[in-house]
């Protein structure tokens, strides 16, 4: 395997230490805070280097999915306890031959008016999932849902939705829209005199925006997938 820089060794040690002490890996922000790296992109650069050199894998569709490779016999095929994987050493690790089949998606905690969707201060983490699971590739971002307005559509508070960025939508699409200063997830129904953002919850009223006040920039994207941590 390729050697590591001092910073890469420090990042890997921190990930292993976190799993050993807490039972799960750190988030990007936790790694950044520990290492004094202000940018999540900077953290990702180190993680990608560790993956490329065979010291780390990131499992699909999981927020805290950093996994040091078990290099002493269990292999990268899974099944080994994470705590065992972090303390074992070794001399070789298989490359990830599915790298080209994955896409990295940023997950944001909130969306605010006047800032880019992927403003660095809003990015919670990144996930890597199969390209076939989301249409739109790098135009897709993840958003953590809060609230119960879409429960009848199977979208619950705490779920992660995948959103394809676009300024248009078809009638009946589930969209993410910026209304006022807050983002909302609703069904999209353009009517003659207004646009109706309809919740999937019989206990909640729709949000009505007059047609004259509606602007395409209010639409941040169309929901193309939902992920729920069990």
Curated annotation (Swiss-Prot):
Its EC number is 3.4.21.88. InterPro entries: LexA, LexA-like, LexA/Signal_pep-like_sf, LexA_DNA-bd_dom, LexA_repressor, Peptidase_S24_LexA, Peptidase_S24_S26A/B/C, WH-like_DNA-bd_sf. Represses a number of genes involved in the response to DNA damage (SOS response), including recA and lexA. In the presence of single-stranded DNA, RecA interacts with LexA causing an autocatalytic cleavage which disrupts the DNA-binding part of LexA, leading to derepression of the SOS regulon and eventually DNA repair. Residues 28-48 bind DNA. It catalyses: Hydrolysis of Ala-|-Gly bond in repressor LexA. The keyword Repressor applies. It holds the Pfam family LexA_DNA_bind. The active site is at residues 149, 186. The lineage of its organism: Bacteria, Pseudomonadati, Myxococcota, Polyangia, Polyangiales. One of its GO terms (biological process) is DNA repair. The gene is lexA. PANTHER family: LEXA REPRESSOR, LEXA REPRESSOR-RELATED. The record marks 113-114 as: Cleavage. Homodimer. Keywords: Autocatalytic cleavage, DNA damage, DNA repair, DNA replication, DNA-binding, Hydrolase, Repressor, SOS response, Transcription, Transcription regulation. GO terms for molecular function: DNA binding; serine-type endopeptidase activity. This is LexA repressor. Belongs to the peptidase S24 family. It comes from Sorangium cellulosum (strain So ce56) (Polyangium cellulosum (strain So ce56)). The keyword Transmembrane helix does not apply.
């Amino acid at each position: 395997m390729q050697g590591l820089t001092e910073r890469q060794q420090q990042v890997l040690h921190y990930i292993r230490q976190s799993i050993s002490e807490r039972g799960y890996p750190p988030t990007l922000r936790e790694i950044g805070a520990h290492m004094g790296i202000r940018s999540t992109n900077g953290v990702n650069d180190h993680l990608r280097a560790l993956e490329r050199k065979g010291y780390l894998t990131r499992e699909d569709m999981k927020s805290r999915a950093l996994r040091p490779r078990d290099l002493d016999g269990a292999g990268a095929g899974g099944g080994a306890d994470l705590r065992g994987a972090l303390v074992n050493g070794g001399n070789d690790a298989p490359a990830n031959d599915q790298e080209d089949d994955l896409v990295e998606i940023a997950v944001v905690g909130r969306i605010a008016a006047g800032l880019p969707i992927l403003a660095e201060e809003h990015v919670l983490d990144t996930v890597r999932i199969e390209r076939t699971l989301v249409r739109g590739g790098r135009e897709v971002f993840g958003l953590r849902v809060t609230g119960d307005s879409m429960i009848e559509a199977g979208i619950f508070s705490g779920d992660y939705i995948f959103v394809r960025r676009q300024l248009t939508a078809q009638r009946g699409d589930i969209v993410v829209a910026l209304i006022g200063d807050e983002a909302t997830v609703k069904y999209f129904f353009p009517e003659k005199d207004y646009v109706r953002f309809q919740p999937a919850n019989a206990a909640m009223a729709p949000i009505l925006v007059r047609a004259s006040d509606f602007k395409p920039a209010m639409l941040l994207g169309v929901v193309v997938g939902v992920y729920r941590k069990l």
